[in-house]
A protein has these predicted regions:
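Active-site-proximal loop/turn and secondary-structure-junction residues that shape catalytic pockets
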Residues: 27-29, 56-58, 84-86, 144
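Gly/Pro-rich active-site loop or hairpin
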Residues: 34-38, 42, 60-134, 147-151
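Hydrophobic faces of well-ordered beta-strands that scaffold small-molecule active sites
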Residues: 21-23, 50-56, 78-82, 136-140
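A structural motif corresponding to the C-terminal end of an alpha-helix
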Residues: 9-21, 124-135, 163, 167
Length: 179
């Protein structure tokens, strides 16, 4: 991979400075899906400075399990980017590449929508993030051609906050013990 000649010196500086780079898994990038993410980590010898910005919106339209990605790359999730995607029913005309149709056009096979209005399994995702011990930043990347941005951004923040609950202090079945 040509990009490795450029990437290794950058990662050397990041290693020296204690910086962790969160690469967004996105078409057109070196790691754009599950297997290209595996191959990229292998190609850079799993250097700790290189991890992922978990953005499930791009995984959804590529048919990648976003929760499985969290579990499989648990030590490489360096940033969480909450953006949602709504998949439209397959109709034999709309593909995953968008067909150069405008955002929000019902002929598209999918669209970005305000967080909580699409098909990303948010609760399962946040439970998986909790299970892997993720304590890093969480951002909301808001894109929705069919909703006012101020309304949508505020609503998205509230939705994500509703998923950030505290863990129980004891297992639920402890209430049934005889002690």
């Amino acid at each position: 991979m040509e990009v490795l000649a450029i990437l290794h010196p950058i990662l050397d500086v990041f290693d020296a400075e204690g910086v962790r780079f969160a690469h967004e898994v996105h078409p057109g990038e070196i790691a754009y899906d599950y297997w290209s993410s595996v191959r990229t980590l292998e190609a850079i010898n799993h250097r700790e400075a290189f991890g992922f910005n978990w953005d499930p919106s791009h995984m959804m339209w590529q048919n990648i399990d976003p929760v499985g990605f969290i579990v499989d790359f648990k030590d490489r999730i360096y940033h969480v980017d909450c953006k949602d995607t709504r998949m439209r029913p397959r109709n034999g005309r709309a593909g995953v590449m968008g067909s150069h149709l405008p955002w929000g056009d019902p002929r598209r096979g999918w669209d970005f929508v305000s967080t909580g209005h699409g098909d990303v399994p948010w609760e399962d995702s946040f439970r998986a993030l909790e299970a892997i011990g993720y304590k890093g930043p969480i951002s909301i990347e808001w894109e929705d051609a069919g909703m006012d941005r101020l309304h949508g951004a505020k609503e998205a923040v509230g939705y994500i906050r509703s998923l950030l609950w505290d863990l129980p202090s004891a297992s639920f079945d402890a209430a049934f013990s005889n002690q």
